[in-house]
Amino acid sequence: MVPVPVILVGRFTEPQYAELLVKQGRADLIAFGRQSIADPELPNKARNGQLEKLTPCIACLLGCVPNMLQGRPITCAMNPCVGREAELKPAEVKKNVVVIGGGPGGMYAARLCALRGHSVTLLEKDAELGGHFLVASYPPGKGEISGAIRSFIVNCREAGVDIRTGTEATPELVASLKPDAIIIATGSVPLRLPIPGLDSCGCSTAEDVLTGKADTGKRVLVVGGGMVGCECVEFLTEREHIVDMVEMKPVIGEDIVPEARKYIMANLEKHKVTQRVNARVKQFYADGVDFTDTVTGEDAAMRGYDSVVLAMGYRSNNTLEEQLKDLAPQVIVIGEARQAPGNSMEATGDALNAALAI
């Protein structure tokens, strides 16, 4: 016990846990920092027992801390409206809006359009909503993303969005909905480069590994050292697989925010993951790859693995824009469907701008 009030702060996202700490006498107050940016209504939702509506901070560090340190206005992947709340006004003309894609960008756009007074239908071809967030919630330390998916779904439904899962957005279906505006939020798909052996080697994607659809065996080679590749390696080493990785760029984890990258790199070192950089893969095999060192020009190989996992990035999945462009006065493409690779902050930021433009 100390004779002064004690305030705890640091990655608190669950009000029930904060309340427990106070009741146990471990602190007098709990401070919510980034969580208050992600969802300023946290105290009210907690008081009213509406925890399912609570949008958690997912610790992405994409728009808050970096912007603050650079002297720029902060934003938030979970709440891009922060600082722009006054812009979210009722629409002057109520429209019929069709949103295609149920990832974070699509759901956020659908909800905001509904809140502005539009009639909104959200079409998602898969049985579940979430998009890339579903996969992103599997790596170690990323479980809070599943809470973000839950809150996006709950808040969409409360706003009155007509959600249709397991429904492919064909031109015929979209036309039958008579849209005044269409938002295409179909995201991205794993990149497959025209490298010899790739189509015949039986490689799995990082997404298949993270979601349990692929059996990798004990020894695994991950091709691609960006964030997805690194998180796939963490996922596998946590399950006692022996994993190595190969990356074309000179740096592993180049697209990871510095605050998170240092922990990931320490984890790779802890599990003795071999990291070959400056390596351009020139041939795929079932048990590994041949590559060329882009610095020395020498050829080398990494072979003898039980499986090879692809994490070479993403490309936009936008096959619908051309097919739908004449079905509504406004057709807006957002997120990774517009430009890949991207991130969650860009997806929800695009969603906000699209909703305000309709």
Residue ranges and their predicted role:
Residues G63, Q70, C81-R84, S188-P190, ...:
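Active-site/binding-pocket entry motifs
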Residues M1-I100, P104, Y108-V120, S200, ...:
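Flavin-dependent oxidoreductase catalytic cores
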Residues I37, E41-C57, T167-S188:
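Small-residue-rich anion-binding loops in enzyme active sites
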Residues L29, A181, S307:
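Short, Asp-centered acidic motifs that coordinate Mg2+ and/or phosphate
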Residues G25, N48-Q50, Y138-K142, C201, ...:
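Short, hinge-like loop/turn segments at secondary-structure boundaries
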Residues R26, R72, C156-I163, D199-G202, ...:
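A short helix-to-beta-strand connector/capping loop
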Residues V22, K94-L122, L129, R164-K178, ...:
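Rossmann-like dinucleotide/flavin-binding elements
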Residues L122-A159, V233-V281, R338-G342:
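Rossmann-like dinucleotide-binding cores of NAD(P)H-dependent redox enzymes
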